[in-house]
């Protein structure tokens, strides 16, 4: 028995969703898109000039100049037109047409699509469950943030208690939280906790539930902090033709107004409202009163305002509902109440109007009577009616300070439309990304909007009469508000477009099932991802750059039809979903989404007006580059470049372009992973000048594209440093730098060091200029310092200059570092050689002219900086240009769908990018000035009493032919000895003061905003607050009495490394002098 295998087998959640077998029509076809976790392509074939694929998540059609990406659950119907045409009708009003060469092929794909878009037999057939299971299955310890981001934030999880506190409900004297609906025993379409007046008992609530349709009793959902008025919601009363009444229902409705009088907004002397309610005390949620008379409101607590009952229907429709057992309130039965009818259409009229709108928007060719056809759909008229109803509610609460009760027939379609829209008009919190999530979760999900029936993804139901774009219509109204008030919403139009897509996509479980009870019974929240993981606050794609935080303005929109706009981004067909957006959005995408290198497709789509003259001819001849309409893609000419490259004997290392400027070496293209080089000894002296001109003109074109004219002068000043930067050549046999700490046999890499080159020859210049160029290449050492998860790619700012610090990405560098970093993006490798004493040495390529040497008071500083960069660049690793695996398509977001384009936001990001580049340029200039002051302070003789140092050192000049003779000449000895007296820095006597956490909302370096997944980190050296990407390195700081490695930012890390290298070099310089004196 003990030898038998165990009867239990442990499986992962993803094993419940095995991948399906791929059916290819042609073997040469490849899947044209990167699949999501859990996604499997089932069919792959060809259409007329297109590749078509069907997975368990989407329909993908790749045309020559465009791409169609449609989730399967967004497809409403599939039809065959004209024998060879397939027409896909989507639920967001779009229509996709695909042509096939044969009738048989068209019918075959019609059957495949029809089977793929059938109603699910069970909820596990929805892709949201497979997606979440595979996200868990592929997650490792390093990718833990992926699962963390699948969940909504704490503001969504604890929204009820947070909202009660934020809105200032007095839970002691006016309101109470009733748990009568615990386990949904009273009403399945309501949440478990309900807010009612404090004196209303649970028994009375049960009696009221028998009188309201679907037991949806009047409950309070919002309180305006400035006026104290509240908004309540419910369903219609069941009066019927018999005229039934319910005393408890009438008492509950009038009690809402009385409770508002007991919990008013107290005006402070400065005019700001203050809530006197005690929110921290215990509530009366579990109190069971025998009679409401014992807890009636205190007389004199304030005169209650007249309550406004807003009926979303017309008066005719409300009276007609009495034949079905419904009806409306009579003002005679409800004292101190007023009834207003809004005249909004029911779901059947909205569905017909939407179908007419879809037909008009997809007419081919473009109709000549477009405006009259659009008017005949009455879609804009329905939006106008909704906005008017919400404005009535907002005006009553804000201006008249009256409580409002909103209902329609059942209370889950037009009621959430009016209530949530009014809350957005009243409360600026709901116009933020965080508040909007709370609003949708509360008014739409908690209070039972039937998303499964209205969106058409409820299993085993084919009732078309239940489908209606109710939520889409409400989002259209939000779009109208965003159009009229572009500065009062934290999110942009792309946010709303994404929300429309995932209302129907079934990629996330947020909008599955009909109510909260069904979601908990089916465990949907734990088995699916949340849509707010994509639309979270930290995602800069959906941030409105025009947003003005801190404004408490109540919005009063213009509701006339002539003031409304058709939502073209959703309703009109996209002629080319990828091409128009890529050219504008490429520079704003997150780095990880662009892949490690430029995708060949994106290079082909580069606008030719941004290209140069014939790049290949210019590089060979050294002529000036002029901006014309040449081919922007050099990959097509790779063969020509390789044929032009030459090689000689020897296994020399490949040298980059800036090194070639000093060494007069012709460029050579990489071939696989081989490392070869060419040495041309007989080059004319003008070759470096020509290449310098090429570099300068290429820099000019890059700057003209990326930078505005407002900072042209700053760019020119900074570019002057780049013109002088190249490589310091060192003798191959003697000019070596020994690394005492290196004991491995691995290969090291060539060190490109900036120097001063003029007309192809190295000149004697001040080391201050060398230090300037050094600063430009210092950032190279940061390449391997900032690891980042690919799942966090949307957390980075789009336009910051810190993209270059992310490993494995394309080298998208700041404009002021193009001249130095471009050559280093190649795979520059070096050989590790053994010296005579057995230590590893790093050999610098090139020969040192006899005329070059560092002399003067800056000699020590220059050598220290060189040593520092030697140590830093040696540990760096650069990726080759050729990427072995294809990069993901850059127009896709994390959900596999296109990124919505917004021209206004793109222009604002360009302005933001220019501003950040200007700030970055000014910071670098300040750093240079500080560096120059530090050099002067370091090299200046200390102010101390005169002393005779002639007997301390004996200067013996050896004549062994070494190039180091001039360094230890008599003229430089005195300056070196004087420079050994290093003055005490003022910072060494001070204690670093930390910036408090509450004062830092953004990273001090990359300016990214802190939130739940991007936490604050203090640098122990400077005390500033950084994100994890900018502050994750550790070093001991003896100056701060911190002898164990502690957390420091990248800037301090570089500064400390430079200081240590300077000290080490100072000690190395003293050893020859001491040996000579002995």
UniProtKB/Swiss-Prot annotation:
A 1,2-diacyl-sn-glycero-3-phospho-(1D-myo-inositol-3-phosphate) binds at residues 321, 346-347, 409-414, 454. Its main location: membrane. It is an enzyme of class 3 (hydrolase). A 1,2-diacyl-sn-glycero-3-phospho-(1D-myo-inositol-3,5-bisphosphate) binds at residues 321, 346-347, 409-414, 450, 454. Residues 154-571 form the Myotubularin phosphatase domain. GO terms for cellular component: cytoplasm; early endosome membrane; early phagosome membrane; endosome membrane; late endosome membrane; membrane; recycling endosome membrane. It comes from the Eukaryota. The keyword Thylakoid does not apply. It is found in: Early endosome membrane; Recycling endosome membrane; Late endosome membrane; Cytoplasmic vesicle, Phagosome membrane. Zn(2+) 2 binds at residues 1019, 1022, 1049, 1052. InterPro entries: MTMR4_FYVE, MTMR4_PH-GRAM, MTMR4_PTP, Myotubularin, Myotubularin-like_Pase_dom, Prot-tyrosine_phosphatase-like, Tyr_Pase_AS, Znf_FYVE. SUPFAM superfamilies: (Phosphotyrosine protein) phosphatases II, FYVE/PHD zinc finger, PH domain-like. Residues 904-935 form a coiled coil. Keywords: Coiled coil, Cytoplasmic vesicle, Endosome, Hydrolase, Membrane, Metal-binding, Zinc, Zinc-finger. Lipid phosphatase that specifically dephosphorylates the D-3 position of phosphatidylinositol 3-phosphate and phosphatidylinositol 3,5-bisphosphate, generating phosphatidylinositol and phosphatidylinositol 5-phosphate. Decreases the levels of phosphatidylinositol 3-phosphate, a phospholipid found in cell membranes where it acts as key regulator of both cell signaling and intracellular membrane traffic, in a subset of endosomal membranes to negatively regulate both endocytic recycling and trafficking and/or maturation of endosomes toward lysosomes. The coiled coil domain mediates the interaction between MTMR3 and MTMR4. This is Phosphatidylinositol-3,5-bisphosphate 3-phosphatase MTMR4. It comes from Xenopus laevis (African clawed frog).
